[in-house]
């Protein structure tokens, strides 16, 4: 199944702009390039192993989704993919789906994880999914904060060195308030960035300073 959706401009927490859209099969080379730019730590936190290269079988599965039981979004800075998020339904007609995302090192800490989670949850609800589940290493504090800060009612279990999270993705007043607050702060930073002086220009002075 294919689906055409417009590219969405996304304002990040630092006031910069990226774009988000559903993944495409033609994204495979860009996904490989992004993976090569990851630090060893980023790879380990996402895949729970060194995972130096993406096997062809995994790559094919990553970029081919049905937009119902499996969905994925990519985030682009210019023409370069810098993040990807996905969910996959746990079984036929299951109300649960596993969610995961990874952000290139240079773009971490700018709110991309929260943006991906929001769009994935919206898409999942339209496909009849009720709950997200996630497995996160305890060392991945940034990922745990993304889930915790979103306002979802999260159930946590720790087993075999992994934090297991389960949470309903229906909007609540808490999640909507978090989204509104994030949008307000992001817009404020964007305006401040736009109005920040780029330098001082002295009018009426020649290049030699002689008037």
Task: Pin down the residues of each PLM region.
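Glycine-rich phosphate/diphosphate-binding loop of Rossmann-like nucleotide-binding domains
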Residues: 209-211
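Long, contiguous binding/interaction regions
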Residues: 1-193, 197, 203-206
């Amino acid at each position: 199944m294919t689906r055409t959706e417009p590219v969405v401009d996304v304002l990040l927490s630092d006031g910069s702009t990226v774009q988000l859209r559903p993944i495409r099969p033609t994204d495979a080379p860009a996904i490989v390039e992004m993976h090569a730019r990851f630090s060893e730590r980023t790879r380990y936190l996402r895949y729970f192993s060194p995972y130096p290269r993406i096997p062809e079988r995994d790559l094919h599965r990553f970029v081919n989704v049905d937009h119902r039981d499996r969905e994925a979004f990519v985030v682009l800075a210019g023409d370069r993919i810098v993040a990807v998020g996905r969910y996959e339904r746990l079984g036929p007609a299951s109300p649960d789906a596993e969610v995961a995302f990874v952000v290139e090192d240079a773009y971490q800490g700018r709110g991309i994880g929260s943006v991906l989670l929001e769009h994935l949850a919206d898409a999942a609800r339209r496909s009849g999914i009720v709950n997200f589940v996630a497995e996160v290493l305890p060392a991945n504090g940034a990922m745990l904060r993304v889930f915790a800060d979103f306002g979802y009612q999260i159930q946590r279990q720790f087993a075999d060195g992994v934090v297991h999270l389960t949470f309903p993705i229906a909007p609540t007043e808490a999640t909507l308030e978090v989204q509104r607050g994030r949008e307000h702060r992001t817009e404020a930073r964007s305006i401040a960035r736009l109005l920040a002086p780029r330098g001082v220009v002295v009018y009426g002075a020649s290049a030699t300073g002689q008037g």
